[in-house]
């Protein structure tokens, strides 16, 4: 493939960001693509092209309606909405494409018509203008082969609703010019999308999963109703296949794409005739269900799981996509609760093999694995790893959760470090976050709510969550945290345990645990006071009142060693820091310390939220006791125990409940 790094932003693109974009096709997904681009790049000039004035008028009205709704919901200011609607026009004239640096076709799945469209586009745009198609199934080699400059063209497959769904497949085909795919990945990542690179196979990666999932559901109609199938399918997805087909008017799509796959790869992919004759399916809405006989439910469950396994191993065996992108794409783009590989891992290789064996017996011709199923499961799902000048750059990638930590993620980070910390070719490590919004938005609550009220189990939970951090404390090779965006809670605690911190200028830090009625249990009450004693008053405010700290302020205080303008510069600076720190010993953090006495405060957060007096008292006691501890290990243990104590308070129950219910906590009734 033409891509250089797993993290799209490690190296700066050689092309500028788009300034003038045209989208051909104003009737369906095209306007949504346009709204996403204008929301991310308000200064962009956007042209919507269509053959029907009515479609253009409706698209412009939809665009304005999206902006109006965003303002009404508090997602956008009036000024931002005005910028999103500025420099947006519609046209019937292809001559208006002149001067565009990117043209996206989202008009048709007819190959001949696509080729005619791109011939018309090439006649009007500069030779270096980028040209892409939003096709969900047609290979780039077929679409662009007749172009004069095919090297500037590829497929960028968006998912509905394109203004909100972050996933986009970027097709790395042999005709793509050097740097094209990487540039598009960079553009998408900078504008909030999740680019997933695939090869130029028919239907690419995610449509292979979704279309065959739906076609298999259609094959089950000989024994079950659409409602029964959707009910069982919700083991895997938030909305069943027939509900989604109704929503997307997707029956013709299944006919089209599975016919293409059948013609290309075999009759076992032929679409079920029922998709040609049914307009809408009778099926329950998400969150509701119908009764299904247990035996029938088992049959449906095995068939649906079987097609997921079959398609997944085929995608990986043929190199159509990566295992990490497959799982993440299924969750983010298609609404699966777990990716196929994640489901297989949780189910166990033996049970997955049973399901697959049954599926292949019932569906001869469908893909079978070339390796033992267990071999497909040995992959990282939440981090990306790149090698930059002898430094391992670890990128936290859970964009749907702002890169929040999970047990799996910390285990994967630790695994990368353990594998390479004794490798002489590796100088050290950089830890950064995916995208531009977040380094890490804290730790997922995970199973913590089940531990409320259990002091010892909660303290042990904090110890378990600290395995990676304690390992970082003892490392000889340097680890540098590169803050590409916000660092909250456990994410900031992770960064604090790295040898050095660097940040982009607009990054910021916060310890919001007190607003949940709990304490930060994995080092925040201990480490910052020992590493940066001059900033003790700042940490007092961050811990007790959830005060924010900007990267610029952290730089002035010496917490952040340097600031960068953007992510590529940030990673380069972090790598340079690693190399400069290589061989140097870390400053020991043992010994009692004497921070300034904690000042009396009102129990009110920096944002005005009333806080729990009891939680603040527990935190203040822990900070004092930890400061007096003779070793770092003893100080950390005080923090673990204090976290356990906080888990037994009424404030913790209220704070965690409020978080889950998406409301403000009321600590007035808890103390």
Please identify what each model-predicted range represents.
Residues 441-443, 528, 538-546:
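Short helix- or helix-capping micro-motifs
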Residues 1-389, 397-400, 408, 451-453, ...:
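N-terminal glycine-rich phosphate-binding loop for ADP-containing cofactors
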Residues 33, 470-516:
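Glycine-rich beta-to-alpha active-site loop
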Residues 104-105, 133, 432, 481, ...:
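Redox-cofactor binding/interface segments in oxidoreductases and associated redox assembly factors
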